Amino acid sequence: MISYKNILIAVDGSHEAEWAFNKAVGVAKRNDAQLTIVNVIDSRTYSSYEVYDAQFTEKSKHFSEELLKGYKEVATNAGVKNVDTRLEFGSPKAIIPKKLARDVGADLIMSGTSGLNAVERFIVGSVSEAIVRHAPCDVLVVRTEEMPEDFQPQVATPQLREKYQD
């Protein structure tokens, strides 16, 4: 039987990512695996600003740090023994499969499905698709069709998002 020992889960604050995170916690527990929770702040967001908005960057960073701290606490409380977090800046499509997966020695990357609509996916593609195409290890993309309509995130709550909105 194949078992995974080093699982990387990508989170972005969306409901889909938290649903995938919950499943990653279950997989990590069943396999007694290391769980690395990653968030990549897409620095391309800032390229459209003529003047670099340091306040916006700081808000994004603080949101991500709080998000990762919350997810680590949930995973630890659920019984995952070895939990780590990573915060990176850059393109999630490149950093997750090409850098982070190798840096942490992941043998499984888990990700939620994209929140993009069909047109956006056609134009820019999804992070999940990029991970599948470029990962050096197995990838599990968690589908959200089975996510209950009343699913309420524990970490990426509306209150947390409101705290860091402009």
Curated annotation (Swiss-Prot):
Keywords: Cytoplasm
Parts forming coiled coils: none
Protein localization: Cytoplasm
CDD domains named in the record: USP-like
GO cellular component: cytoplasm
Record PANTHER family: STRESS RESPONSE PROTEIN NHAX, UNIVERSAL STRESS PROTEIN UP12
Stated family: Belongs to the universal stress protein A family.
Protein name per UniProt: Putative universal stress protein SERP1273
Organism: Staphylococcus epidermidis (strain ATCC 35984 / DSM 28319 / BCRC 17069 / CCUG 31568 / BM 3577 / RP62A)
